[in-house]
Amino acid sequence: MRSSIAFLSLALLLVAADAQAAVGSRVLVQDDGSLKINGRVVHLFGIYMPKDGRICDNSIRPIRCASRAASALRFRIRSVVYCENVSKNRDGSLNAVCLISSRGQIFEPKTDLAAYLLNEGLAVALPNAPFEYKTIERIARSQGRGFWGFFADSIN
């Protein structure tokens, strides 16, 4: 019983500390779809979003890929963003799994931002991505969401 109470107390302290750190963080979605949190650039782990200016082209309906993904992120992020660092890039930016809650409540189920973009068809799962990401991408592709809503000759 005591160990359960101690564990629960520790868990609540960790969640509160995490929430406090996240609440103080200002999140800015950059044009390339990366996040800027406390001055650091954070890329969503496991996905590729075509860089700004690149065209998803089917020769009939060209569309700027990155602007759609960045707009979707800006629309979706309305509360606290919780990021867990996975790796660091040579340029000092981070690759992280980032989650949000729709109403900003600590105990509410979180939405994975990378999974959200994959589900909307606005990103591609990388080879090192979790199996779930690859599955979400395949489903979005089969249902014609986002980039997959037309037969793309290329994503340049």
Regions found by a protein language model. Name each.
Residues 1-4:
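Positively charged n-region of N-terminal signal peptides that target proteins for export
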Residues 6-15:
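Bacterial N-terminal signal peptides
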Residues 18-156:
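Small beta-barrel nucleic-acid-binding modules, primarily SNase/OB-fold domains
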